[in-house]
Amino acid sequence: WKYVIDQMSYFEFIGRPPMLKHLWSLSVEEQFYFVWPAVAFLLMRRWNRRGVRWVAIALALLSTAWMIRLSVSNAYFDPTNPIDPSRAYFGTDSHAMGLLVGAALATFWRPGRLQAAVPTGARVIVTGTGVAALVAVLGFFLFVGEDTAWMYTRGGFLVLALVVALLIAMATHPASPLGGWLGTQPWRYIGQRSYGLYLWHWPIFMVTRPTLDVPLDGLPLLVLRLGLTFGIAELSYRFVE
């Protein structure tokens, strides 16, 4: 929220960006973790899991609608005079849909109660759906950016959250081999160290700017950055985390 109040841009900067700028997403998470357990507890006392689920869904839709409203009313993506969309991107109110979709999923998806022995057709459907969701997530990663207009104006962040929720559900279904595939190396190694990789990648990238900080560019620079990121994340995982 400090970034929002200071009108700091996530997308544009002059000089070296703040070393801890990427921690905004962890701030959104922690704010959610402070508030949502109490909300869920009160809802469970009055209703049940179903009540928690519908409130989470409603709030996810409201967060998405608010992001759309901010994007349209502020003309973030006006082709003649676009405005920086950082307010909608940084805001907990406008970027909480993913957390809320996860909260909704947790109220009804219980893979431990599902059967691993299912008909072949059902196994194919579960596995195929999971693989399709995984491909879709990779497609978002490769071809969609945080400054893509329809992510803001058409509910793209909610769509991505739903696809990820579907992937989680199918990967944890006992009848699907997808979870086993994702649990093999090197994916398990990366997953175990993903928090450290996220924490360290940004400052490392910011102190290795091409030509400005290091005499490298392109693939050699990427190799250096990834090597440093994985190396420091490994030390962090072993001796700190």
Describe each model-derived feature in a short phrase.
Residues W1-E241:
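Membrane-interface helix/loop caps of multi-pass membrane proteins
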